[in-house]
Structure formats: C-alpha cells, structure tokens
Amino acid sequence: MGKGDPKKPRGKMSSYAFFVQTCREEHKKKHPDASVNFSEFSKKCSERWKTMSAKEKGKFEDMAKADKARYEREMKTYIPPKGETKKKFKDPNAPKRPPSAFFLFCSEYRPKIKGEHPGLSIGDVAKKLGEMWNNTAADDKQPYEKKAAKLKEKYEKDIAAYRAKGKPDAAKKGVVKAEKSKKKKEEEEDEEDEEDEEEEEDEEDEEEEEDDDDE
C-alpha cells in the first residue's frame, strides 16, 4: 500500500487489525527501546484475541465499522490519477483470473493444517503450506497443475471473448501484435494476482478466526 497515489484513501481495517495496532502501541509505551519479533508478537496477539470475550472485542468491532464508513465515504470522492483507473477499478463482469496449481493445493490443505494446528498464525500456516508444496513430488503436483492449466485455458478463451465483445474494432485489428504483448502482460499480472489472492485469503482467514471466536 506504500506504492501508488498518496492521496488515495487509506484502506479499511478489520477489528483484529485495530486490536493488533493497540497491542503494538501498548508494547511501545511499556518497552520503548525494545525491538519487536514480528512472528512472536503476532502469535501472542492471536492467542490474546482468542481468549477475549465478545464484549471486549466490541470496541474494536465498532472501530472497524467506523473505519469502513470512513473508507467508503472517502472513496466516493476520490479521483484516481490518469492511467490508474483501469488497474484500480476492475470490471466485476470480467472473467476472474484462474488460480495457480499452488493456490489449488493451498485451498485443499489449509483447512487440514488449521484443524491440526489451531494456534498457528496466518503467516505460519502459509509458511507450512509453502514447505509442503516444495516437498511434494512432481507426480503428486500433476493433478493440481493439470487443473490449473484447464482453468487457465478456459480463462484465456473467456477473456478473449470478453475483450472482443468490449472492443470489436480491436478484435479485428492487430491481433498478432496484441497476442504477443498480452502474453507478457499476463505473466506480469499472474504475479500480482497471486499476491491479491493471498491477501484475500489472509482477510478471509482473519474473518473466519473472528467468527469462530465469536461463536
């Protein structure tokens, strides 16, 4: 979020993010000169959050609601700089980029890891999944790679149809040139979108964690 337009409204924070921020401020007041081990600190915050009552979490949930309202209000009046509009505001009707083989693997094994190690932080779960994938034999990776390839093939057909529908003249002209630049662009976008997918997952995991605790 450090990149891009400095005038863009700050992203909305979850109740858990407000809680972690408060913990960090408390820690700084008590130990102003101490360095913070991030993974250790995150683990302690996660454990403390799980033991909190719904009433204690209430103030952070109120802060999150107020921040969400602030973000939505500011986004209504925000005008992105030229050239950024296309990237920042994606068409909801556009075909969704397919998941990678690793992402499909994570979707299958994440619930198992969370079930076996409920105390693990989101970062530790991601690290464990990365280790598991690296230690998985090439033959065992094949089903995920085949599925990812099929989904990518479908996506390419869908996106070609979507682009042709949106720009009929462009579909007739310069197809060969467009294909070359498209491939390069998609390779770059793949990396960005995998990061987006991981961020989305982290947010989902955070919300799941909060929902589980509220129950």
UniProtKB/Swiss-Prot annotation:
Keyword Repeat on entry: yes
Residues of the DNA-binding region: 9-79, 95-163
Database matches in Gene3D superfamilies: High mobility group box domain
Record: residues binding heparin: 2-10
Skewed-composition ranges (Basic and acidic residues): 83-94, 161-179
Main subcellular location of this protein, as a coarse class: nucleus
Bias (Acidic residues) ranges: 187-215
UniProt-annotated location(s): Nucleus; Chromosome; Cytoplasm; Secreted
GO biological process, one term: positive regulation of interferon-alpha production
Pfam family, any one: HMG_box_2
Motif placement: Nuclear localization signal (NLS) 2: 178-184
Region of interest called Disordered, as start-end residue ranges on this chain: 76-95, 161-215
CDD domains: HMG-box_HMGB_rpt1 (cd21978), HMG-box_HMGB_rpt2 (cd21979)
Covalent link (Isoglutamyl lysine isopeptide (Lys-Gln) (interchain with Q-?)) residue numbers: 28, 43-44, 68, 180, 182-184
InterPro entries attached to this UniProt entry: HMG_box_dom, HMG_box_dom_sf, HMG_boxA_CS, HMGB
Annotated site location: Cleavage: 10-11, 67-68
Residues the record lists as ADP-ribosylserine modifications: 181
Disulphide bond pairs: 23-45
Modified residues (Cysteine sulfonic acid (-SO3H)): 23, 45, 106
Entry GO CC: chromatin; condensed chromosome; endoplasmic reticulum-Golgi intermediate compartment; endosome; extracellular region; nucleus; plasma membrane
Processing and modification events after translation: Phosphorylated at serine residues. Phosphorylation in both NLS regions is required for cytoplasmic translocation followed by secretion. Acetylated on multiple sites upon stimulation with LPS. Acetylation on lysine residues in the nuclear localization signals (NLS 1 and NLS 2) leads to cytoplasmic localization and subsequent secretion. Acetylation on Lys-3 results in preferential binding to DNA ends and impairs DNA bending activity.
Keyword Lyase attached: no
Domain-level remarks: HMG box 2 mediates pro-inflammatory cytokine-stimulating activity and binding to TLR4. However, not involved in mediating immunogenic activity in the context of apoptosis-induced immune tolerance.
Function: Multifunctional redox sensitive protein with various roles in different cellular compartments. In the nucleus is one of the major chromatin-associated non-histone proteins and acts as a DNA chaperone involved in replication, transcription, chromatin remodeling, V(D)J recombination, DNA repair and genome stability. Proposed to be an universal biosensor for nucleic acids. Promotes host inflammatory response to sterile and infectious signals and is involved in the coordination and integration of innate and adaptive immune responses.
Assembly information from the UniProt record: Interacts (fully reduced HMGB1) with CXCL12; probably in a 1:2 ratio involving two molecules of CXCL12, each interacting with one HMG box of HMGB1; inhibited by glycyrrhizin. Associates with the TLR4:LY96 receptor complex. Component of the RAG complex composed of core components RAG1 and RAG2, and associated component HMGB1 or HMGB2. Interacts (in cytoplasm upon starvation) with BECN1; inhibits the interaction of BECN1 and BCL2 leading to promotion of autophagy. Interacts with KPNA1; involved in nuclear import. Interacts with AGER.
Protein name: High mobility group protein B1
Organism listed in the record: Bos taurus (Bovine)
Gene name per UniProt: HMGB1
